[in-house]
């Protein structure tokens, strides 16, 4: 399964060990934007950024990220729809 260019993660349980493999798949699939809403969303955004940047030696690894504490899932989906990074409808992933 390939992921869309825009992703919204709805975190129901907070940061998870599965995040690293998921982000690596995002990079492989050409995901351009990831927004995180829900529990620990700011922490999850930081973790995603760390995974993407890695040791900093590969400047082709890039995903724009945002976190949305206190915002509804619909607000975050709307934000993802209008952001110019990436094309198409955002894909919702619940963790």
Regions found by a protein language model. Name each.
Residues 1-95:
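ATP-dependent carboxylate-amine ligase
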């Amino acid at each position: 399964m390939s992921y869309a260019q825009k992703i919204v993660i709805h975190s129901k349980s907070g940061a998870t060990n599965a995040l690293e493999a998921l982000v690596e798949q995002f990079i492989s699939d050409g995901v351009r934007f990831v927004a995180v809403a829900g529990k620990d969303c700011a922490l999850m955004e930081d973790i995603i950024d760390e995974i993407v940047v890695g040791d900093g030696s590969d400047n082709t690894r890039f995903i724009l990220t945002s976190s949305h504490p206190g915002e509804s899932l619909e607000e975050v989906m709307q934000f993802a729809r209008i952001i110019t990074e990436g094309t198409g409808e955002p894909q919702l992933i619940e963790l």
